[in-house]
């Protein structure tokens, strides 16, 4: 496996990230303005995603569609929402009338032929900040750590990872732990570790 701390190795990628958030008014007593700014900083998330791509693309045996391995331009959506909204989406799309922490909607079509330098749509990741906040308290780590955990989980789903068995879930969760250790080069990286 590649040394994840070797910052000299990088894949030249462009990520078009659409970042949307919900009104944090409901959680203003729980989350300070500095954390809200960090959560909603598009560059922070884009840098994390690029570092995760670096990690995946340098390891040819990992699950990743060939169209992704051949492309360098990607588009995806990241939506932060609340429990009520994610419950409605979960009910509509997965027929489960309950809130959840993360949903992902992969959009990759392996058979599409893209012109050079065309953006490949990966899909969308939706995360409930309310659930992430609760889970961060349960696991005794920061909200930002939990959000990165959930976004990395959704990201792997966009790339075709799944966990129908406990063995595949354990493999996916172990790889998520590696992804979270990759340096992301963000100027806010030190701030991310403070939370």
Swiss-Prot record:
Cofactor requirements of the protein: Zn(2+)
Subcellular location field: Cytoplasm
Molecular functions per Gene Ontology: metalloendopeptidase activity; RNA endonuclease activity; zinc ion binding
A cellular component term, taken from the record's GO annotations: cytoplasm
Family affiliation: Belongs to the endoribonuclease YbeY family.
Keyword flag rRNA processing: yes
Top-level lineage group: Bacteria
InterPro entries: MetalPrtase_cat_dom_sf_prd (IPR023091), YbeY (IPR002036), YbeY_CS (IPR020549)
Organism: Prochlorococcus marinus (strain SARG / CCMP1375 / SS120)
Chief subcellular location: cytoplasm
Function in brief: Single strand-specific metallo-endoribonuclease involved in late-stage 70S ribosome quality control and in maturation of the 3' terminus of the 16S rRNA.
Protein keywords: Cytoplasm, Endonuclease, Hydrolase, Metal-binding, Nuclease, Ribosome biogenesis, rRNA processing, Zinc
Name of the protein this chain belongs to: Endoribonuclease YbeY
């Amino acid at each position: 496996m590649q040394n994840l701390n070797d910052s000299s190795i990088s894949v030249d990628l462009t990520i078009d990230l659409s970042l949307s958030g919900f009104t944090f008014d409901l959680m203003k007593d729980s989350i300070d303005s500095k954390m809200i700014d960090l959560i909603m900083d598009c560059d922070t998330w884009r840098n994390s995603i690029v570092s995760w791509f670096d990690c995946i693309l340098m390891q040819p045996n990992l699950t990743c569609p060939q169209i992704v391995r051949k492309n360098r331009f990607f588009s995806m959506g990241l939506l932060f929402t609340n429990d009520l909204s994610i419950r409605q989406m979960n009910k509509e799309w997965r027929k489960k009338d309950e809130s959840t922490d993360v949903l992902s909607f992969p959009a990759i079509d392996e058979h599409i032929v893209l012109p050079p330098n065309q953006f490949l749509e990966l899909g969308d990741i939706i995360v409930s900040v309310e659930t992430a906040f609760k889970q961060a308290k349960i696991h005794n780590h920061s909200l930002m750590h939990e959000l990165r955990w959930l976004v990395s989980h959704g990201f792997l789903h966009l790339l075709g990872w799944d966990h129908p068995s406990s063995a595949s879930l354990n493999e996916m969760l172990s790889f998520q732990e590696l992804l979270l250790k990759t340096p992301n080069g963000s100027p806010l990286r030190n701030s991310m570790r403070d939370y």
